[in-house]
């Protein structure tokens, strides 16, 4: 369908001596089985699978050091693997090599409730982490929808439905441990809430997509569970009406915890997938956190703003089971949308624009989508200016892929013109590489490349991602 790999000459077989060394060190935790390689050679991106030559399952930082050191010794590429939920081709072994599966590194290493921090291994998922925190009165709020691994969320600088209130991984990672391309271990940051000590290496690794090293520990900021939580939904005649409600809500300072947008087509898919009966119209999902009085005040204010923008059917969901059902439906929207076109794949956009430009960006995008022959539902974390179009294509029809990429190009060009970015939370991977020079300029890309080659001079760490070396 879509072929991201460099010419075949850039791939070479895994040296037999290295495979022997891996098996001697890790035994059955090394696999060259076709099924295992196939599982680790694809993600949720529209690209064709690109399989690694071997998969190693790590259980500790020492394991990671051993694998990285062998890759360095034999000049073999290495691709970190978490939960496999990437949408941009991060996990594809475009030059072969070793896929390093971190899913068994899934422990909570320490909880410091007084400091509101936790240190975890990269393979733990968001849901598992919050389950471990359940009795502390604290939670980790970053919620990308998929039950992604914390390591993958860190590597892509992810965000999600709660970003409007709690920020992204950029704000919530306090420090980390990473294994560099030569096997050395670097520790960054601290548990302190601020520091002026030297370069901010934590931020350098957050969003590096496995190209600078393998993250093996992450220290995260936690937040107290709110006293009261309430959710609501509201429908609108047009997408512009819904988006203007969000803009006004943000601009007057209402501290909403979540605000999600879904268009009519996305609502239709959610209804089918989750057995709901939501009105098939542009819809906002809200959530409010705070005291009982504060939540009530926030919700009433937002309801009034929605009414001024032709919002209708403002419905509350105060019982936990009702809120859970509502947000589960939103979190499953990606897979619900795929069911609109059985057998399809999705080309997913991820632009983010200044909140003042969100209405213009969404409304202009709507014009493009109306002219397309492809199903193109829209969802988004519109509270921070981020929205996604899932362009559904038949993987066996190249003309549909070409149309999808044309739509994607127009959306990205529009976002950049409006002062935004090509990717708000999914990362660059393979799919967004071509947009980076337009967004940042050649000098910035050259600076990024210089950092990459200073830490990984042979380009072994997840090569072929973000930019070429």
What does each model-identified segment do?
Residues 1-469:
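Noncatalytic alpha-helical scaffold of FAD-dependent oxidoreductases
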């Amino acid at each position: 369908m879509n072929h991201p790999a460099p010419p075949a000459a850039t791939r070479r077989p895994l040296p037999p001596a290295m495979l022997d060394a891996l098996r001697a060190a890790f035994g059955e935790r090394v696999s060259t089985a076709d099924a295992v390689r196939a599982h680790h050679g694809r993600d949720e991106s529209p690209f064709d699978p690109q399989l690694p030559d071997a998969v190693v399952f790590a259980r500790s930082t020492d394991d990671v050091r051993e694998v990285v050191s062998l890759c360095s010794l034999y000049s073999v590429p290495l691709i970190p693997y978490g939960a496999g939920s990437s949408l941009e081709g991060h996990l594809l072994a475009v030059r072969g090599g070793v896929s390093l599966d971190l899913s068994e590194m899934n422990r909570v290493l320490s909880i410091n409730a007084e400091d509101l921090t936790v240190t975890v291994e990269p393979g733990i998922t968001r849901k598992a982490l919050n389950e471990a925190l359940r009795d502390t009165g604290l939670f980790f709020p970053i919620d990308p929808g998929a039950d992604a691994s914390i390591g993958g969320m860190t590597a892509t600088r992810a965000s999600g439905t709660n970003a409007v209130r709690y920020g992204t991984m950029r704000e919530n990672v306090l420090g980390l441990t990473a294994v560099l391309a030569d096997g050395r271990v670097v520790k960054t940051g601290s548990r302190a809430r601020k520091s002026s000590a030297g370069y901010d290496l934590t931020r350098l690794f957050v969003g590096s997509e496995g190209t600078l090293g393998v993250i093996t520990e992450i220290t995260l900021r936690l937040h107290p569970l709110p006293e009261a939580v309430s959710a609501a939904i509201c429908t609108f005649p047009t997408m512009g009406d819904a988006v203007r409600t969000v803009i006004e809500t943000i601009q007057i300072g209402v501290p909403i915890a979540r605000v999600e947008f879904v268009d009519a087509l996305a609502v239709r898919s959610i209804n089918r997938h989750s057995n709901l009966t939501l009105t098939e119209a542009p819809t906002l999902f809200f959530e409010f956190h705070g005291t009982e009085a504060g939540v009530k005040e926030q919700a009433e204010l937002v309801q009034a703003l929605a009414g001024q923008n032709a919002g209708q059917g403002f419905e509350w969901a105060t019982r936990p089971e009702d809120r859970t059902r509502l947000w589960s439906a939103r979190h499953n929207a990606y897979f619900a949308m795929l069911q609109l076109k059985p057998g399809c794949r999705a080309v997913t956009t991820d632009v983010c624009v200044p909140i003042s430009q969100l209405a213009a960006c969404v409304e202009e995008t709507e014009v493009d989508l109306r002219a397309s022959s492809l199903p193109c539902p829209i969802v988004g974390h519109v509270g921070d200016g981020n929205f996604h179009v899932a362009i559904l294509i038949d993987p066996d029809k190249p003309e549909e892929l070409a149309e999808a990429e044309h739509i994607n190009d127009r959306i990205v060009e529009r976002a950049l013109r409006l002062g935004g970015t090509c990717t708000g939370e999914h990362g660059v991977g393979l799919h967004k590489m071509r947009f980076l020079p337009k967004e940042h300029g050649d000098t910035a890309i050259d600076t990024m490349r210089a950092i990459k080659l200073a830490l990984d001079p042979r380009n072994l760490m997840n090569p072929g991602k973000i930019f070429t070396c």
